[in-house]
Amino acid sequence: MSLSLGAAIYIALKPIFKIYTIMLVGYLVAKFDIVSMENAKGISNMVVNAILPCLTFNKIVSNISWRDIKEIGVIILSAFILFVLGATGALFTTFATTVPKKFFWGLIFAGFFPNISDLPIAYIQSMGNGSIFTAEEADKGVAYSCIFLFIQSFLMMNFGMWRVVGLDFRDTKEPDSENITPSVSPAIDDRKLTEITKLPNITRPTNAYQSEDARSNSDLSCNSITTNEMTPQAFYEGFTGYIKPYKESNGASHKFESDLPHAEIYRVSSTYSSPGALEFSRIDGSSLSYSRISKNSDGRSYRRKRKADMNELISKYSAAEKIRQGELDLSRPLSLTEEVGSRNASIGNVHTGYTDESSIEEENCTNMATDGRGSLSFFIERHNLKWLQYFIINCLRPASLGAILGIICALIPWVKACFVTTYVHVHKAPDGEPVLNFLMDFTEYIGNACVPLGLLLLGGTLARLEIKSLPPGFIKSALLMTCFRLIVIPIIGVLWVNKLYSIDWLDTGIGKFDMILTWSMPSATAQVYFTAFYTPACGDHIQMNCLSVLFVMQYAILFITVAFVVTYTLKVDLKV
């Protein structure tokens, strides 16, 4: 079968149109606050910890066998070359252009790790309609992409390379937290009333009829807390649990939590049910704007939802205050069930980071039962094996575990035969299928949701990026890095893959296509969350601004570069 040039271009563009349309839906969903940042974070955790492991396990077990060991080795080698080549391009960019000192390591990270998860998988799945590749070949290509993704995840999480982003924040000066947050404890004393009365710059909320521009300029600053007119006596009615409500002439009641984290800011806003009632809502970042208050024709007030912005993203992911206060130890693994953990994980009784009174009591009650694990902890400390502990704990991440189990099951013939039909004879279930085939049905059913949800989240992430200010000359840096990432590296990738094919290290067309496509991807969007993790709530957010410019440039021309590379691959390399 021979395709015309126009047909090849259309086939190359069609998957891109689908991908960009899904991303557009995610963009609009985030912009109109249909899915809040909190909900998006929950969905992201679900994808990473439940859906992605199912997809990885299913595709690897179904399409990889011991006969593919050579291809797996080639993929691993090619992945390391791709990562090193991207980092080299980032280093060249730092020497050739003016890159801010506070974004040096961020640019290195952006060059090192490409987006080899949702985008290439979605593209390859779209090509499996029989015109170029069969459905079986497309599934095998997805399995190859899952191995690429596993290698990147292994380096990023198991070896802790995600912490490279934090090197840009070493010189960040944290604002004095005493000037921005009140510290309230359950103890009843007059000192708490004095602290509350000294809150700086208490201002009234913005007028209900003010313009959008005026409202955007009334964001909370790092040294102010927005509240309604409330007397200090309203707070000082008791400091156990919630502050006891008091009654004004209009019958409004107020409540306040006494158990306030040190680094959090609280605001007062009108509730939906009663315009007179006030409630405190917690804000993790102090630069979030107040929800706009309007009135309808009946005179009832209501609040309009805030537009999605970068401050909201930072407020949900930032752990800068916890790191500064020592509540989070980055030399130890973070939570295994979050994409970007907000607390430390632990092994045995090696507690990491923050511990509260209940955890201390629990530890005291179980000391007798954990002597062995305590000895293990002592052994790890004595022989300086924390790096090994970090590596092993991160192997228990669902994303890593799904790939590891999938590779093990796929490379052992009689184990694989328990899941899918192979040449190895094993006893079948009554329906003629392998005994554990129901697990393949389960993982396939759940894994099918991975790519659409991932693309929706990608669009939502891009919607929350903002460019507020840029260092002089960084536009040239971002442009050069974009050209290197999306033009130079794909050209080198085509040459590399053709060399592998000529020496019989790659045997299949889908293997060539998947590898060339992987080398054509933009920077990993996971960097947005890692950067937000280190970003303080207050400040100029220079790292997020630079990262926003970089992603906007890359995704603005991605559809052109990928279409060109795929068209060339189809006509010249695959000769279709």
UniProtKB/Swiss-Prot annotation:
Q: Where in the cell is it found?
A: Membrane
Topologically, how does it sit relative to the membrane? Answer: Multi-pass membrane protein
Might you name a Gene Ontology BP term for this protein?
Answer: transmembrane transport
* Phylogenetic classification of the source organism: Eukaryota, Fungi, Dikarya, Ascomycota, Saccharomycotina
What is one Pfam family matched by this protein? Mem_trans
Topological domains, Cytoplasmic: 1-8, 67-71, 125-141, 422-437, 498-512, 567-576
- Give TM regions: 9-29, 46-66, 72-92, 104-124, 142-162, 401-421, 438-458, 477-497, 513-533, 546-566
- Which residues lie toward the Extracellular compartment? 30-45, 93-103, 163-400, 459-476, 534-545
Q: Which family does it belong to?
A: Belongs to the auxin efflux carrier (TC 2.A.69) family.
The name this protein goes by in its record: Uncharacterized transporter YLR152C
Gene Ontology cellular-component terms listed: membrane
Coiled-coil ranges (or none):
none
Swiss-Prot/TrEMBL keywords: Membrane, Transmembrane, Transmembrane helix, Transport
